[in-house]
């Protein structure tokens, strides 16, 4: 349920949320590999569809916000214009919101719409360098839809793009596993359960009933807030 109904900024899950998650994931990798203190330069390449429609979908801003450590589910949308303006005017990126590094938007972030990866058209590469220009870490990401991302390494293990779980917890064994609508209906028939009961039982393996109910209430609250925000906003 929380892979299908997830809170994130727009206008696109594949071109905005996914790239932001990629940037945030890259920061986590730098920290996990103890490379973060050495980073003095970051390069971002947007390719294929991410580049072709990147400006309209704010893909460029999304990646930078992810590199700042921002999460698409809790980001303060009113602060985004100021953060991006600060990057462009000061030629500086606040990595993970704590480490300032030089960043020239016009040269350190490139749009390459003609570069098409055979695995998926929504492709980006992020590379980190030290103060001597030595490459510290590079990762190719695919934004495969719905806000899901895959690394190049993960993609090599698959025959075709497939969305990964949003969290490691989602990989736990489920009492009523299914991957298609037909399999879901078969679980219902086999165990004499409603569709709602099957879904609820699977969810409660991952999270408590209280957490599920509170999270669903929060999602509805954000939906309502988005409606109100849209109705009260001015301009195109």
Range-by-range predicted roles:
Residues 1-8, 43-46:
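Short, hydrophobic/aliphatic alpha-helical segments
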Residues 2, 34-38:
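N-terminal glycine-rich anion-binding loops that anchor highly charged ligand groups
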Residues 5-23, 56:
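Conserved phosphate/anionic-ligand binding catalytic regions in large, soluble enzymes, centered on
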Residues 12-16, 49-53, 209, 213:
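Hydrophobic alpha-helical scaffolding
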Residues 16-20, 57, 213, 217-221:
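Electropositive phosphate-/nucleotide-binding environments in soluble metabolic enzymes
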Residues 21-32:
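Intrinsically disordered, low-complexity, positively charged segments
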Residues 37-76, 80-93:
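A structural-propensity feature for long, helix-poor, extended segments
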Residues 72-236:
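C-terminal regulatory domains involved in ligand/effector binding and gene-expression control
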């Amino acid at each position: 349920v929380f892979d299908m109904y997830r809170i994130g900024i727009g206008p696109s899950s594949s071109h905005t949320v996914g790239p932001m998650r990629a940037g945030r994931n890259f920061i986590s990798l730098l920290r996990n590999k103890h490379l973060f203190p050495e980073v003095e330069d970051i390069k971002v390449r947007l390719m294929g569809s991410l580049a072709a429609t990147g400006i309209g979908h704010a893909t460029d801003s999304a990646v930078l916000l992810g590199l700042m450590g921002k999460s698409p589910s809790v980001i303060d949308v009113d602060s985004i214009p100021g953060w991006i303006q600060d990057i462009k005017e000061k030629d500086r990126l606040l990595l993970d919101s704590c480490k300032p590094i030089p960043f020239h938007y016009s040269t350190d972030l490139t749009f390459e719409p003609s570069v098409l990866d055979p695995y998926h058209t929504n492709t980006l590469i992020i590379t980190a360098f030290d103060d001597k220009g030595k490459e510290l870490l590079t990762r190719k990401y695919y934004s495969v839809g719905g806000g899901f991302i895959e690394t190049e390494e993960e993609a090599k293990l698959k025959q075709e793009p497939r969305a990964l779980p949003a969290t490691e917890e989602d990989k736990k064994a489920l009492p009523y596993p299914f991957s298609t609508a037909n399999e879901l209906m078969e679980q219902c028939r086999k165990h004499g359960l409603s569709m709602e009961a099957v879904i609820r039982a699977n969810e409660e393996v991952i999270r408590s009933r209280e957490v599920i109910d509170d999270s669903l209430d929060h999602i509805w609250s954000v939906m309502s807030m988005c409606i109100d925000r849209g109705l009260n906003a001015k301009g195109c």
